[in-house]
Amino acid sequence: MRNLRRRASLAAAIGITALSLAGIPAQAGTGPSLAPTARTSAWTALPAAPVAFAAAETHKGARSAASGEPVCTAPYINEDQRLGPKSLPQKGVLGRILRTYVPLGGLPPQKFLDRYWDWSVNFYRFPPDFGFAHSGGYPNGRPLIASKTLRVGERVDRFGSENGAFLAPYGTPYEERGIPPTSLDTFPDSPEYPCNYHVYRVIKEFAVDFGPIASAFQQPGGGSQYHLVSRLIAEAPQNRDEVAVGWLVQNGYLVRLN
């Protein structure tokens, strides 16, 4: 039984990596369906344009203060990549973002997976309505979504690849973001982004869907999220509902800060 469980965990971990690299949005769910979809805008990756102070602050928290070992990589909780890394940053911006985060919300690993893992798609169940909170906190309440313009100079961030279509105000605590623990896993082929964390500055204003984040994955939510939608960005490809972060970088709306 133990070997079967380990094989199941390995298969699930492979599925996580494949879905993440395919561009599963990493900020919230993707609409009324509980299963996420890989909707991305076509773009070509550009060389990073790092800004020294942001990169230094982010990577300052890339190793555990206690052990000096790499963080946000193996070992994983319960030896299961789906549950996120055991070792998390304690310093820098990542340390501040994770300071009050309680992994799995204190649930035992198997109970957490039973509650939030969808075996039919081999990924997590996301809240409906793109992860936005509902009026009055009621499941049948109105989704709390408004339009907002991000101004030049604002800093935003995300946990997840640039194929995703969600951002948050810079430094939003992890437990307020409505994302699963696996979003903290550092991509093996992108070790320069510990915890899969990316920071950007707005260099050309654009509009987004904006609102509070629903509780999810045993975390309270309550932070703000920016959903990148093509109907609000005239220059974006209109054959998709969402706009990838990478497209905004390539087309001069965002600049990477780490």
Outline where the language-model segments fall.
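Active-site or metal-binding loop neighborhoods of secreted/extracellular toxin and effector enzymes
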Residues: 207-258
